[in-house]
Every structure is written in structure tokens, then in C-alpha cells.
Amino acid sequence: MTNITTVADRYTAVWNESDAQLRRRAVAELWAHDGVEYVEGARFDRLDELVARIAHAHAEFVGSGTYRAAHAGDLRRHGDAVSFTIRLITSTVGEIAWAARVFLILDAEGRIREDYQLTIQPLADR
């Protein structure tokens, strides 16, 4: 059985990874080949779309040095379903700027088959 702390740590690390090649490799290792992410009414299918979506979010939020991604440690599991809160933390003062509840459905190998992000604390106007 997959360790959910490892899943949450690896998931969070993907959003913080600044090297595009390492980030792509991490996405390929974490998501199933037919993995999908649903966020804010959008759907991102398979590796190329997932990599592009994460690269865009990284450039906008983390790559600028304004924020870093972190999970809250509130990990839960039921069978192949895993949930936890992911947050954007301000780099300067460590405040929570945004948060979402993540629900993951894992495949038999422990890779993400489905990823749902539901915003619970919207990002304030910048």
C-alpha cells in the first residue's frame, strides 16, 4: 500500500520544482499515464497537459519567489482515495495566501489517476 505522506510530499514538491526537466519527470512518476486533474472547472488530461498546467502555476506563483507550496499535514485515506490540504505560503512572512482541498484517486501502482483541487481559501487580489 502506498504511503500517503510520501504521495502528499511528492505532490507538493512537483509544484515547487523549478527545473522544467525534473518537474516533467516528477509529474510522469507521480501521475498515471492516463491521469487527469480537475481544478476550477478545467480538466487537464495526460502528461503533456498536466506538465503545462503545473509549469504555468509554478511560473505564476512559485517561480516568482512570492509563494511556496506546502501541504497542511491533514492527510486522510480511504482505500485508493487520498485527501489533504495544499496551500500557497508567502515566502516572506509565511502566511497562508491560498488553500485547496486535494482529493486523489490512486491506481494499483499508487500513481494519481484522478486529481481534484477544490479551493477553500481563494487567493486575495495581488
Where are these regions (language model features)?
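Short acidic-aromatic low-complexity motifs
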Residues: 2-33
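Hydrophobic pocket/interface hotspot
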Residues: 11, 27, 35, 50, ...
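Alpha-helix boundary/capping and short turn/kink residues
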Residues: 17-20, 40, 44, 94
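Basic/polar N-terminal segments that are highly enriched at the extreme N-terminus
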Residues: 1-6, 122-126
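A beta-strand edge to alpha-helix "cap/lid" segment located at domain peripheries
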Residues: 55-126
